[in-house]
Amino acid sequence: GCEWVSWC
């Protein structure tokens, strides 16, 4: 998931 990450 790209909700809590910054390196999607």
Swiss-Prot record:
Q: Which domain of life is it from?
A: Eukaryota
| S-S pairs | 2-8
Q: Which family does it belong to?
A: Belongs to the O2 superfamily. Contryphan family.
- Residue numbers of Cysteine amide PTMs: 8
Q: Could you tell me what this protein does?
A: Its target is unknown, but this toxin may modulate voltage-activated calcium channels (Cav) or calcium-dependent potassium channels (KCa).
* Protein name (Swiss-Prot/TrEMBL): Contryphan Li1044/Li965
Localization annotation: Secreted
Q: Name one GO cellular component term.
A: extracellular region
Q: Which residues carry this modification: 6'-bromotryptophan?
A: 7
**UniProt comment concerning the protein's domains:** The cysteine framework is C-C.
Q: In which tissues is it expressed?
A: Expressed by the venom duct.
Primary location = secreted
Report the GO molecular function annotations: ion channel regulator activity; toxin activity
